[in-house]
Amino acid sequence: MFTIGSRVFVCNENALIVRIFGKEFVSLRKCRYIDFFMDIQYLIRLEEKMQNELLRLCTERGALKGVVLETEDINEQWKILAPEYMADAVPEIAKYPTVSVSWAAYLGLAVAYGWDADWETFLKMPYQSYYGEQGFDDMDEHIVRDLLRIPLDSRTAKDMESTIRACGEKIVGLIRFEQIPPQSEMAFHVFAHACKVMFRIGAAIQLKRMGYNFEKVKMGN
């Protein structure tokens, strides 16, 4: 356990400290962050609101069917990829706010595809494997064209891009409505939760595309 200012961290060995917005943050994979002053319930409620709004939007567009399909494996992979994704996305917030959250959905598409295709191989792939020729900037096109094998000029790709862009715009609108001070610690945490929601939505869209469905299982007596 150690502190940075008034903040307290409980970490594993080799924890990575990164600086974002001039503040120090710890790798989500290595540490558990304890903040006695932050309204955790607020973040949980906001995350639920974001996910519900995106679920409604995606269902209206036919990308989902009223449920966010998910697996524990895929959700856990976000925890591994999140620190490096955040390091790429945060600098994009000011100029490209929609991109900064939307690319997490494409990452979700890719991870869900890997979970179905060859999970053991995809688990070993570093975050940078999802980069396009221009790195983070064209990650979206690389994932759609090269991983999912969907031609970028196809109706499927265009519909997917339109839906993810709409989700990103919805998320940005919800964040702005909260009137959180920019570049504050709370703003960082809200952004992190927003990216997690976008990742899950992207994964759910791909799981549906691959034919997975949610089924209730009745347990025997």
Residue ranges, per PLM feature:
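Intrinsic-disorder/low-complexity detector
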Residues: 22-221
